[in-house]
Amino acid sequence: LAPASLWAERNEGTVWISTYTKNLQRQIAQELRRVYPDPAVLAEKVTIRKGRENYLCLLNFEEQTGRLPVLIERETVALGLVARWLMATKDGDLIGGDFPSWAFPAPGFAPGLTDKQGECIYGACPHYRRCFLERVGRKSRTSRIVVSNHALTMVEAARHAAARGTDGDGNGASPPLRYVFDEGHHIFDAADSFYAIHISGREGVELRRWIRGPEGRSGRRGRGLVERLTAVLDDAPQELERLNEIAQGALALPGEGWLNRLSSEAPRGAMEKFLMAVRAQVRARSEDLHSPYGLECEVVPVMPELLANAIAFKHALDAIREPLVALALRLREMLRERSDEVFSQHRMRVEAVLRGIERRAVLQIPNWIMALDAIGEQAPGGHVDWLSVERFEGHDYDIGLYRHAIDPTVSFALEVLEPAHGAFITSATLRDRAPKESETVDGWRAAEIRTGAGHLVMPAQRASFVSPFDYARQSRIIVVTDVSRDADMLSAAYRDLFIAAGGGALGLFTSVRSLRATHRAIAPALSQRGLPLYAQHVDGLDTGSLVDLFREDENSCLLGTDALRDGVDVPGRSLRLVVFERVPWPRPDILHKARRSQFGRGYDDQLTRLRLAQGFGRLIRRASDRGVFVLLDARAPSRLLAGLPQGVEVQRLSLAEAVAEVRAFLQQPGLADNRPPQ
């Protein structure tokens, strides 16, 4: 932060600081208060950017207040709390910001006040000029420091890249040119999500809603493209005709109740027929149709019915794309040519709508058409296609055709790193192995794979620094050898270890089901000993609030999944024990198999070492910290532990021995405050 702020001030420029997790973003925001201690200067110089779904939508709030007579009591109280918060909030961040979600009386109500469904009507909204999201976007153009996440940073870079290829100007803002990527080991994952193509039912429903607006009995607020532009194009009959063509074409996309219709084998429209054929091929090639987890299969060899429906769906998309492209060109001409008073009233709305049109007409729909074109063939070089039926707790919730790049950092390097004037990528776990071994070329190769640096014309500069912590003195690593995968034994192990540590324990799981089962089993025993237990996917709080509660109560315990393995900073007494349920192997799905084929047989080990190292990294945050890292998996091979700090002996112990070691180590002199309660 210090070098970034100094450079920004001296050069009157902007530096984007990008993270992967909300937890680290919050920590950086707190640290920036030390860089800019004056609150007024901080507000002027720094912008925190998050996704749309984080900010309170003022129009949603207005509509909820209109429903006061029919709200239940706790929802009425919740709305009053939000109203009080609105008068004091800095940025309107309802999810993980300054809103006290821990005190919220109606879990699940607050997220409904954000725009998670893409219902924003932009310039047509009466609150547009006061909109928290728009205000943050405008402010980021003049800030010295912009704190974002990897996904938003890539969105911004892609938007400017697309604008360079059209007549657009990127909304009048200069593109980001200087970056600091913290949590750089997650660039690969962020790019994998951002540069993927998902032709799924949920995506199709959203595209239809964006064009036609809410339909059926959903009662959702929002206006589609047709309603937003009808008044603007009132004196342009040819453009109104194009708008009508687009609306008619959107009938080929899934509508409300599409999953039920597919289950009943009664699809409507080209895309629903395509999705039903996808579902049929996946089910025909799956061995366990009753699995609670998602099903997937290769596209090739393709079933004739799927191929025929893919061709029909592609033609339907062409019928949407062609008039959409023509409409976008005409709207941009109108923005350049018309300055009359009547059109000036609509200018802001047209600019907002045009951004949405170009995003879909230039990126989304052409990408879908490209993937459908190749459905009977192998995916183009460097990519992998597959069909999937996504499930949650045994119920289908999405179906689609998916295309991912085997190495998504190629696009990241092209769109983000190459145009940049400077990019600094940092992480304590960028390299694969422990420090002495990872000074070799192989160690840095893993870093280049995760960050895309290997795709740059000029090689990236490398720098590594020795940790300031004495891990051999401050920590212990234990592999428990006699805990099976039986749910009761696993729960008993967590219970005994948490009690031995006297709280201050973080339990990490590879599945939500196992987490919930363990929570049910150990909560009574911990409660009897005065050890509060919090858990993701159980407590109705966002991850940031759970971590805050865990941090403040030194004897509490917390259960979580991946989000708590990365980017959580809990120094001091509040975290002295980390327990992994099992070795966090990557899931051997179709995409992972393709990557393992390209990156080599050691790819699985690289990912697993990274995850273990990240979990261990939560434990020691200060020179005065002490803690124990426990892995409840007797089959953990020693090679996977090579990424953990050197000098710390890996002890393979029985559960009883591990419990005794945890208790003894945490009671050693120098950590008296961490001693478990008697």
Q: Whereabouts are the PLM-identified features?
A:
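A substrate-engagement module of RecA-like helicase motors
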Residues: 12-15, 19-144, 209, 216-284
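Conserved RecA-like ASCE P-loop NTPase motor core of nucleic-acid helicases/translocases
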Residues: 14-21, 425-426, 504-515, 631-632
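Non-catalytic, alpha-helical, charged scaffold/linker segments
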Residues: 66, 200-371
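A contiguous, basic/glycine-rich beta-loop/short-helix subdomain that forms a polymer-engagement track
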Residues: 110-141, 154-167, 320, 327, ...
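SF2 helicase catalytic motif II
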Residues: 173-195, 199
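Conserved RecA-like P-loop NTPase helicase motor core
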Residues: 471, 480-485, 538-637
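Conserved interdomain hinge at the start of the Helicase C-terminal
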Residues: 478-510
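Conserved helicase motor "Helicase C" RecA-like lobe of SF1/SF2 P-loop NTPases
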Residues: 510-537
